[in-house]
Amino acid sequence: MTRALLSVSDKTGLVPFAEKLVALGYELVSTGGTHRVLAAAGLDVIAIDDVTDFPEMLDGRVKTLHPRVHAGLLARRDLPEHMAKMAEFDITPIDMVVVNLYPFKSTIQKDGVTEAEAIENIDIGGPSMLRSAAKNFAGVLPIVDPADYDVVVDKLQSGSIDADYRKSLAAKVFQHTAAYDALIADYLTVAEFPNNLTLPYEKFDDMRYGENPHQKAAAYKTALPEDYSVLNANILHGKQLSYNNIRDADAALRIIAEFEETTVVTVKHMNPAGIGQGSTIETAWDKAFAADDVSIFGGIVALNREVDAATAEKMHAIFLEIIIAPSFTPEAFDILSAKKNLRLLTVPFTTTVPQKLEVTSVLGGVVVQERDLYTESKANFEVVSKVQPTEAQLRAMIFAQKVVKHVKSNAIIVARDGQTLGMGAGQPNRIDSVVYAIQKAAVKSGFDEAVLASDAFFPMDDSVQYAAENGIRAVVEPGGSIKDKDSIAKADELGIALVFSGTRHFKH
């Protein structure tokens, strides 16, 4: 008779599956709570301590860690010496293991959970049985996911369980136990950058393709999800998010989290196209749209206030890929959902993004750093010019600094009164970014109180000179160049304000 060992925390589908195994001729062995559930259902099931001839002990910490269990799992059926040794010790082979693990993840997500509670939910016996079964998949079926129960039964009934399917179940086990261990390691780790980096992710979706149609792609989210994330957004309307949609929406969420004020952010290819602030969400939209009414076409929009009907009517008039907001009024939703392909997402707005490690792939490995969550403040500004910036210019500098950190370096932002006017992004030469940003801004009505912000220092005074000669009256940059004195002298010569923020914001 074939034997199946069942020991599960998640009892979903357990009894029907076990009943079908019995009908297929399986003898059932089980542990603890699983044994009680199966027995209560009227199934003939052998208790694990009747197999091991040893009682469960240490509050259930030791149940299946026994040679009679693991020999039954690890013995190779194709080796006569293995089977002879099994017979010598009267050990029955185990042909199937059905195990899912203690709920460590859900335990540590509970409010007020103690370390002791978390540790008690670290499974030892379960992973050991799964790994033994998965190692010996040629002779043992390892099943870790209740979603596989029906498929396994169908294949057993049809006799279609082949080597490839066995191998796929084994791979699933090792993926599952690796993720389980990674989550535990992450929970217990206190080092900022441990010697071995284990980051558990769970598949969110298979993408139609990646950045381009010839690239395969999938999306994964962290095992402990962040509420403020496009991967945990509520999709109210529209089709599946693409790879590029997710990247752009993520960029929009990162930018808008900088602002408590009523703000609208538009994004194209992960750079802000236009940002506007106003007393209402409609006026904020008007300013964001006016900031760049061309680049916004086919873009992503994020708003940090509820979308009303008036704002929805204006957004409906142009082609957009995604609109993200905390909520939509019923009227706004009706207006926008009339567009079949427009994705409408809700995400709970926050300005408190948690500090996490950012992982970037490079050939042969990854580089890891903290998120850039530096908070801009006038208290950290140093006015280095003779001309003092006005209060309006200082406010614009704070706004522009919050934006420029999210623009691909070399990054320049021209801004005024809660509105971006021009952006220079991704140029290898900083002066080229300065020129482009000012040229973009020049189509707006004048530069009164407009400021220019740079993500990094000016290596020479040409950026200050170009800004001043083209109507900019105040500049903010980190400082730190060996030629800072030249930029300061040029600002004084041309009568503009120059402020050092003291903080660089490269973005690659």
UniProtKB/Swiss-Prot annotation:
Keywords: Hydrolase, Multifunctional enzyme, Purine biosynthesis, Transferase. Its EC number is 2.1.2.3, 3.5.4.10. Pathway: Purine metabolism; IMP biosynthesis via de novo pathway; 5-formamido-1-(5-phospho-D-ribosyl)imidazole-4-carboxamide from 5-amino-1-(5-phospho-D-ribosyl)imidazole-4-carboxamide (10-formyl THF route): step 1/1; Purine metabolism; IMP biosynthesis via de novo pathway; IMP from 5-formamido-1-(5-phospho-D-ribosyl)imidazole-4-carboxamide: step 1/1. PANTHER family: BIFUNCTIONAL PURINE BIOSYNTHESIS PROTEIN ATIC, BIFUNCTIONAL PURINE BIOSYNTHESIS PROTEIN PURH. The keyword DNA repair does not apply. It catalyses: (6R)-10-formyltetrahydrofolate + 5-amino-1-(5-phospho-beta-D-ribosyl)imidazole-4-carboxamide = 5-formamido-1-(5-phospho-D-ribosyl)imidazole-4-carboxamide + (6S)-5,6,7,8-tetrahydrofolate; IMP + H2O = 5-formamido-1-(5-phospho-D-ribosyl)imidazole-4-carboxamide. Pfam families: AICARFT_IMPCHas, MGS. It comes from the Bacteria. InterPro entries: AICAR_Tfase_dup_dom_sf (IPR024051), Cytidine_deaminase-like (IPR016193), MGS-like_dom (IPR011607), MGS-like_dom_sf (IPR036914), PurH-like (IPR002695). Signal peptide: none annotated. One of its GO terms (cellular component) is cytosol. GO terms for molecular function: IMP cyclohydrolase activity; phosphoribosylaminoimidazolecarboxamide formyltransferase activity. This is Bifunctional purine biosynthesis protein PurH. Belongs to the PurH family. CDD domains: IMPCH. NCBIfam families: PRK00881.1, purH. One of its GO terms (biological process) is 'de novo' IMP biosynthetic process. SUPFAM superfamilies: Cytidine deaminase-like (SSF53927), Methylglyoxal synthase-like (SSF52335). The IMP cyclohydrolase activity resides in the N-terminal region. Residues 1-144 form the MGS-like domain.
